[in-house]
Amino acid sequence: MQLYALGLNHHTAPLAIRERVAFQPDRLDQALQALTDSRTVSEAAILSTCNRTELYFAAEQPQRAADWLAGFHQLPLAQVSPYLYSYPQRDAVRHVFRVASGLDSMVLGEPQILGQVKEAARRAEEAGTLGTLLHKLFQNTFAVAKEVRSTTAIGANIVSMAAAAVHLTGRIFERVSDQHVLFIGAGEMIELCAAHFAGAGPRSMTVANRTEARAEALAARLGAQTMRLDAIADALPRFDVVVSCTASPLPIVGLGMVERAVKVRRHRPIVMVDLAVPRDVEPEVGQLDDVFLYTVDDLAQVVDAGIESRQQAVVEAEGIIDQRVDGFLHWLHARDAVPTIRALREHAETLRRGEIERALRQLAKGEDPQAVLDALSHGLTNKLMHGPTRFLTQAEGEGQAEASRVVQQLFNLSRHD
């Protein structure tokens, strides 16, 4: 069973074609069931956005997927096929990683695509078409996309320390104007950051501070709301962006609090910018899949990188993706070997049991134990070596050299052993 990606996008097809093969959300379950009912496809997920329609699937033979895509939309295959691309295994994995990381987007590094890929995986899981291969693929995809966005400047052009928080948010959310922002603290750094966010026109801003009077004063200047610190835990799911900088000696935002918020948000991403020293947000929060946590050091590094970091980020992102593709394919190949490993062990166990039973019969007859053990070891050795020996002696011509190489590698032999 192999993984494949098939589809078309803004690089290969005009809008007039893309809109004709887009999947409506209310027909997605039906489409997934129909695709996997075709017998040639065992697992499937469908990503359908304004700029792309892609099928990610596991199959023995991928050819019929294009026929199915055209047929589902009642289009002649000849009308669709000139715009289609099809990627097998390695190329498919790399493509999905690049898509989710924003490297294949119309706007380089745009953040919405990751949420759309997550939604495609969720819909496939709900429809029962997300099997072991695709589940593992999407797990790796989300981890790669997060690594790319967290460790490169693929979606940002940072120009100042205070503006960095807004630009870091822009890596994850295309429009800050659609987001709800929470500021924890009311000192100078928070005020500077809040001014930059206000310039981006977020949907709402809220200030939480230990001293309510300072929170109210800052909120009044920004046209923001206020909140008590002890209300953050319950209110956190409402916010898409959290910027914190207090003088608290202990973290204000804990792992459990954020885990609950992510669950309530149905895994919509949340950006946390922690400018405090000591930190206001527990570091473990950064390990959560849907949380993008940045510290004061992260902002400093991005500022130092400057405007040229964007093109360098593409190179860095491609390097990350290439490494992660190799890792995923290693898992795939190891998984493919499992049936052979199981059969090999079962074969060896059958031989072992046969020799043990023969030895026990000989011992029951009163034969010399040392002789019985010698016979057992020789018998087991001969039976285990019979297959490799036969493999070598039956090889002919150029195949004999290859057979010798395989056996030497298999048993960790050198030519002088």
UniProtKB/Swiss-Prot annotation:
Domain of life: Bacteria
Note from the entry: During catalysis, the active site Cys acts as a nucleophile attacking the alpha-carbonyl group of tRNA-bound glutamate with the formation of a thioester intermediate between enzyme and glutamate, and the concomitant release of tRNA(Glu). The thioester intermediate is finally reduced by direct hydride transfer from NADPH, to form the product GSA.
Name of the protein in question: Glutamyl-tRNA reductase
Keyword presence, Cell membrane: no
Annotated family: Belongs to the glutamyl-tRNA reductase family.
PROSITE patterns: GLUTR
Subunit comment: Homodimer.
HAMAP family named in the record: Glu_tRNA_reductase (MF_00087)
Keywords in alphabetical order: NADP, Oxidoreductase, Porphyrin biosynthesis
Domain note: Possesses an unusual extended V-shaped dimeric structure with each monomer consisting of three distinct domains arranged along a curved 'spinal' alpha-helix. The N-terminal catalytic domain specifically recognizes the glutamate moiety of the substrate. The second domain is the NADPH-binding domain, and the third C-terminal domain is responsible for dimerization.
Amino-acid positions noted as binding substrate in the UniProt annotation, renumbered to this chain: 49-52, 105, 110-112, 116
Pathway: Porphyrin-containing compound metabolism; protoporphyrin-IX biosynthesis; 5-aminolevulinate from L-glutamyl-tRNA(Glu): step 1/2
Residues binding NADP(+), per UniProt: 185-190
Active site: 50 (nucleophile)
Catalytic activity annotation: (S)-4-amino-5-oxopentanoate + tRNA(Glu) + NADP(+) = L-glutamyl-tRNA(Glu) + NADPH + H(+)
UniProt EC number: 1.2.1.70
Purpose: Catalyzes the NADPH-dependent reduction of glutamyl-tRNA(Glu) to glutamate 1-semialdehyde (GSA).
InterPro entries, per the entry: 4pyrrol_synth_GluRdtase (IPR000343), 4pyrrol_synth_GluRdtase_dimer (IPR015896), 4pyrrol_synth_GluRdtase_N (IPR015895), GluRdtase_CS (IPR018214), GluRdtase_dimer_dom_sf (IPR036453), GluRdtase_N_sf (IPR036343), NAD(P)-bd_dom_sf (IPR036291), Shikm_DH/Glu-tRNA_Rdtase (IPR006151)
Catalytic class of the enzyme: oxidoreductase
Organism: Azoarcus sp. (strain BH72)
